[in-house]
Amino acid sequence: MKITKNKILKNKKIINFKYQKLLDLFYNVNNQKKNNQLLSYLYSFSGKIIFSLTEEKSLKKILRFLMRHKIHPQYIKRIIDIKKEIDYFYMIEEIKNGFIDKKNNILFLCTKDLLPILIDDKYIGNIKKNTNNINKFNLSQLILNHPVMHIEHGIGRYKGLTTIETASIQSEYLVISYAEGDKLYVPVSNLHLVSPYTGTSIENAPLHKLGGDDWNKEKHKISKTVYDHAAQLLHIYAKRESKTGFAFKKNIEKYDLFCNDCSFKTTSDQNEVMKFVLKDMSKPIPMDRLICGDVGFGKTEIAMRASFLAVSNKKQVAILVPTTLLAQQHYKNFKIRFSNWPVNINILSRFQTQKEQDLIFKHTKNGRINIIIGTHKLLFKNIEWCSLGLLIIDEEHRFGVSHKEIIKKIYSNIDILTLTATPIPRTLNMAMTGIKDLSIIAKPPAQRLAIKTFIQEYSPILIRKTILREISRGGQVYYIYNKVQNIMNIAERLSILIPEASIKIGHGQMKNIDLKKVMNEFYNNKFNVLICTTIIESGVDIARANTIIIENSDHFGLSQLHQLRGRIGRSNNQAYALLLVNNFNKITSDAKKRLEAISSVDNFGGGFSLSNQDLEIRGVGEILGKEQSGHIKNIGFSLYMDLLKNAIDLLKNGKIFSVEKSLKKPLEIDLHVSSLLPSSYILDINTRLFFYKKLANAIHEKQIEEIKYELIDQFGKLPDFSKNLILIAKIRLIADKIGIKYIKSNNNIGIIEFNDYGSINTEYLLKMFQKEPKIWKMETSTRIKFILHLKNDYLRLKWIINLLRNLFKKNI
């Protein structure tokens, strides 16, 4: 819902107001002076103040800030709910700019007024660059004694964090134990060298000897075989690039009109992804793009816009879906979305009679059908097209290898757009290596709440309580039971347990007409509890259904659980997922891991994370075959993917592959300063690990700045040691881009050694030696020394950053 100043006070009690624009009242976490100005203004304003906020993350941050300063706003749904005795309120609505209602003496403030840093639309991460690190698992999820991989020393076991002080310098270290009890202490500034090990079960993970030669031998051996695999993948890529496709042209006026018909405001992620899709479709090379976004994040709208572009170019669109229910759902949505345009949309599934199917085939051939949405029937050999231009594959993980082979044969020269919430490992692998283009929608729609997930042993009392809570607020419930032969018994049992509920069943073995009727009735709220199989896993989108109960949840795959849970939480109401097991003590270890994973990922955008965790649970054989999976077991998935990506980059750029280039030694930094997030600042170890890893994996300075502001917002002013940590992260980032081998410095001298001078501004380097010969000295052909007397660590680090920026040829 969008609110304007003319609309927000539309209630009869408050009308005809005069308004004035606000002064500069930004809440800026990096500027205490402005904070004080804002607070002073809020304290002194004589009337009511309403904070009109939308994004959940921003809402929490603003409320925390206000409460720290003794301002406790009360939540209201409507303007008329304001109370005389209270001065501060907040509501979940969207206004573009804050203003003052002078007539009623009300100050309205929006998110934009308070958090310009965090919602600046100009900063949208480059999707391709961000995906470079998608195979880097989150270190904050590390568990004591679980395997980790250090790129230089091999696979050991994580033993926690420890703070060590030497010569008055404090630093925090990640501790890894190796064979024979040896321990490695990794400075937190070097966490980019560490990743959780994934390749086989925890129990069977290798354990290397610290200082031994086995690890280096293994890396060298595998890096050679990786080259062959890289060449194979590049052959696939080159084959795709050599094909001739159709270059779509955009009629800007028509396209903008279609976009304006959208009933909701698209997120910045959706807009950015659509730019990539439009760019792909405009090229005379067939598009092959994977869009990964959680359920309900707006992938369908992107598919609709791509379809509109295709139809505008007189091309047909095929939308391939795994289930009849999803086909029905898309058919309804596409019909509504294209209702203002002369576009003929049809559906092909088992719900159509043979006569209807024959007519559809006829109209597909003669071009009367512009967009067809169908199940596996779209893969029939006898289907002919007039002018097919775009294939959209939804829920790609539901299609098997045989289906993929048919798609390759039938649809080899057209644009392909793949949509998924949980990509299968093979697709994930191709996306990670850049063979398949990848876009991620990570930002949820405004006002969407994360689903609360609970895992419990079976309990009739709990089931009754859960269902009654939902139907008492006018909602609906999915009850998943995946054995058709017993589903009637479940319905009888629930009818006795909850007589207040109206219950019906739905499953894939019902007659088409009966299943269609049940689903339509549930959609139209004719009953409130649907007992069904996983038939609703894809394609059911009902805003009122906000509770799902899954019996025998330990029998489901991780992707299945995520998809089922995604059927709820599509409105602004809090949604609940109850996963039931018969006996915790009797479920398998893999089932426990799946349930732990699904319950831990209740945040938005969890599908991608779950794909990685699914990979960890099931192993990697599915991705690359037996030989490669054996290599991955020996060195871990993360390093294997790094080696593969390095090999692909070398081959793409026409460089000669060498083991040395593939396994270049990581940058070493030793700056003799205290740099850590003290436990007095962040108590929780995993939270500290999370921020350490974020800093270590940053690929832009702007990302480091964002992390800095995130720390300040959540935990307050940065301690001096933490300021040093931020600066060292920037030094590492720039030094790595230049090609520095190591950089060492104390308060008196410093040494920089280069791998090569490829990215160095040699002109600037020569000027330094000529201008300040007492400071600079060339020790070897690749090593320079500088003499520096700065006792303040912070100033010294800033000086080094400035030096590195000047040394870098390109603008960082």
Curated annotation (Swiss-Prot):
GO BP terms in the entry: regulation of DNA-templated transcription; transcription-coupled nucleotide-excision repair, DNA damage recognition
Top-level taxon of origin: Bacteria
Annotated Helicase C-terminal domain residues: 462-621
GO cellular component, one term: cytoplasm
Keywords: ATP-binding, Cytoplasm, DNA damage, DNA repair, DNA-binding, Helicase, Hydrolase, Nucleotide-binding
Top-level EC class: hydrolase
Binding sites annotated in the UniProt record for ATP: G293, D294, V295, G296, F297, G298, K299, T300
SUPFAM superfamilies assigned: CarD-like (SSF141259), P-loop containing nucleoside triphosphate hydrolases (SSF52540), TRCF domain-like (SSF143517)
Coiled coil location: none
Motif (DEEH box): 394-397
UniProt GO molecular function: ATP binding; damaged DNA binding; DNA helicase activity; hydrolase activity
Similarity annotation: In the N-terminal section; belongs to the UvrB family.
PANTHER family with a match to the protein in the record: ATP-DEPENDENT DNA HELICASE HOMOLOG RECG, CHLOROPLASTIC
Name listed for the protein in its UniProt record: Transcription-repair-coupling factor
Organism whose genome encodes this protein: Buchnera aphidicola subsp. Acyrthosiphon pisum (strain APS) (Acyrthosiphon pisum symbiotic bacterium)
Higher taxonomy: Bacteria, Pseudomonadati, Pseudomonadota, Gammaproteobacteria, Enterobacterales
